[in-house]
Amino acid sequence: MTRSSYSSQLPIVDLSAADRDPQARRLLHAQLHSAAHDVGFFQLIGHGVTEAETRALTSAMHAFFALPEADRIALDNINSPHFRGYTRIGDERTAGARDWRDQLDIGAERAARTPAPWEAPYWWLEGPNQWPEALPELRTAALHWIERLSGVAERLLHELLASIGAPEDFYDDIFGPRAHPHLKLVRYPGSSGDGDGQGVGAHKDYGFLTLLLQDQVGGLQVQREDGNFHDVPPLPGAFVVNLGELLEVATNGYLIATNHRVVSPPGATERYSVPFFYNPRLDARINPLTFPYAETAPGVTADPANPLFAEYGRNELKGKLRAHPLTTARHHADLLLHPEAQPALSS
């Protein structure tokens, strides 16, 4: 299968076809193969997540952003050496530029871990979340969403691997109970005062799969083969799925991670989105995938400014240190002053 001419619209993939007859599953695999190899993005329907589950999360999210500013700032990401909590507008960076959005970062609820001097510093990324006392329903809805979408993503990954002739359970052992999922609740509060328009700058995700729930405002753009960024019109009830850099590494570039960005909505219009990142254990090493098309893989897209590593935690910590300079300065300045302590920044 070769990369082909494209439509500006993303492919639509119905995951429920996996549970129908063998012919329907074969068609699903053909669609997944093409979408992951040619585009790196697609719209996912038939995923089984109900409207009630979605409403529970989005209602709690809107209630969170409607809290008094002081209540949100009490959960400031800068309080957390684990990079959990609330990030104010402009405090996160992509490629060094300010992102015009605020957000709440949530992960698996675990005890704080302080790595010993001989341990990898990425273990700082394990720890508790910060929750607003006034909204207990947010904790319930967010942790349910993480569990629910982890199941959807696992199923999708199985079908995706099968679609390229690989063993569908090839990566099961790097996920499991110590997987490192990540959820963001994001608000884009209209255009910035300086007219920059960067909701979030162009980037690729560094995990395995991202499942994005977006509202109907729009603003997500994907870079296609022509080098231009194309709008992704919202599709009610669908998740926008994109492949992360680890799948590109695992397949030596046969499956592609694609640049994408968000353009700030115009004027005072607000945009809300919920990206879920399906990530393996922090200490997982991503072995090359064995599959029939491996000989045709073009190789991984090289970016000297953003080296990729087979050990997942090194990639995530590298990204967090760059994206959250204030939290990094407070809790992890030693990793910048002594980069040899953090292999991801020096290898």
Q: Where is each model-derived feature located?
A:
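C-terminal flanking tails of non-heme Fe-dependent oxygenases
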Residues: 1-95, 100, 143-144, 148-347
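Internal, well-ordered alpha/beta segment that forms a basic, Gly-enriched binding/recognition surface
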Residues: 81-121, 128-129
